[in-house]
From Swiss-Prot:
This is Putative ankyrin repeat protein L91. It holds the Pfam family Ank_2. Keywords: ANK repeat, Repeat. The keyword Repeat applies.
Amino acid sequence: MDLGEIEKDFTKIDEYFFDACNIKSYNYNGTYYCCKNISSTHFTKLMYLIINEKNSTNGHQKIIKYLKKKINVKNPSRINRQNDEGWTALMIASITCGQWCSIETVRLLLEHGANPNIQEKNGLQLSGIKSQLAHIISLICKTMRQKNSNPENGFTALSLACAVLDTGESVEVVELLLKYGTNVDSINHNGETALIITCQNSKYFHSIFVIDLLLQNNANTLHKDNNGFTALIHAVSHCPLNIVKLLVKNGSDVNATDNEGKSVLMHSTKNSIDIVKYLLKKGAEINHKNNNDINVLFFASKNHVKSDVIMFLLAKCSNPNEINTNKNAVLAHVCRQFNHHKNDIDTVKILLENRANPNIIDDDSRTILMDICTDYQNENSLDIIEMLLKKGANVNATDIEGRTALNYACMSINNKITIKIIKLLLKYNINVNHVDNDGAHILIDLCRNYSRYSLKVVKLLLEHGADVNITFGNKKWTPLFFANENLFSSSEKDPERCTKLIDLLIHYGANVNAVGKYGNNILMEDTTRNLECPNSITKHLLEKKINVNHQNDNGDTSLLLVYERHELERAYSIAQFLLEHGCNPNIINKNEHNILTILNNDIFWNFEKVIPHFKLFLNYNFNPNIYQIYGCHFILINVLLI
């Protein structure tokens, strides 16, 4: 926001405040504004006259007349009375000069003994500010944040004047206050002096004149605020070079550090390369490290600084692969940013061109590529991944869990960016048949953790030669088993999506009659679950010619397993479904067990409930003459033949 816009906005807000608050009769218990956003009660009459000076006829003359009253002449200390917020008349005049009152009023107060060193005691607060005023209040926001607030140290008239340097009157106010003996190094709640406050607001044209005034009056350039920031640290972050030069010329320490050990040089990287070069010329230590053992190159990389600064620092810091205590090289540090900034792409490019190692790993043997594929996926990530791969990043590197970048990308499928990342990894020939330390194939992971975008990725992997019949775990399940299980294990229960995955696997050669560890096929797994069966997936598998009479290692069929695992009521509908699709009710397993032997107890104790089952079997070529159980054979035959 330029000066013209600021003045225009102040004019609008002046009208708002005067109309809303200030043009009303004086009342000691009334509420009035000390400045644009701070209100208080218990205003003195002098304060009231000051805030209304420019909005009333002969406003300044009214102030002169008031100060000449006998009560004020006999009691000169009355001029320093404070309102409920701890503000004096001089404070109010200093911060509103040029807007609500005149520079002559500030001078008049000082001539009548106003004390420029009184500090407000309640602390400046920003609560209750109207939203339409926020862009104006930002002029003084930095000086009002209350950190480690101490009621003994508040803002003085000088620090308030330095908080708003948008007009020429602000400079005159500072000059007057200094002339009348204000303490140039008085500190506020945040440990900030007038010099520090001015450097925070130094984007305004008049700031350099005020800084020069403060320095001429021996302002302490080495003082640190509560965060350990000196005026120079604040200045190098955003001020123009001429202000930085002025501070250094007047004794500022170019190697000062804040509470986190960050140096002036580190903070300067966020500004411009000219300031970085100037500080180094003046003796700034380039090899300094902060409390986290991070050097200036690390710090600059972390803060998305411009590429010209990175390039310059690389020329000064010869080893871009230097490791800090967290074993993060500069390259890894940049690539592991949560949200990749456009400047990060330029930084990565520069680092790689200057011999940075794209295969550096952390304590878990994770590469930069793995980390980006896991947590830091956005459009800029694609550019960074391709740069790493072009510069020799090992696409098939594994971590301590035996996982590759492709494993991690497939674990994090949540948007279209992931699909693009996987395509990029495939372009650089990542191994689609890699198996991790647990024996899990990527295709297995995708099928057992099926999500919205999984189908596209599975198709990509199959197109690039992924083994569709790979097995995993003690059960020796193939991807088809896991795809089928999704209907039962997924909270979404989406049969249509599961069907699409099953069809895709079968299209690329999945064996529909594959068996697990004990010889069970998928149909057996489905029919023996304590869940809804038959279901759309089971029916679909039968359409795909799964063997309904397949026998497992024990010789059991799906029909035999149904009666081994389920109650009679539950078994009937499943048995009917299997028989309708060609299941043979006469098969005997390796233990010489058949349907009658399995239903042995039910024949004796639930005979009436068994009858419907055997009638069902008879409809599907059941041969009762081959069975005989403890003398019940003839009774059963007679019943069934009735």
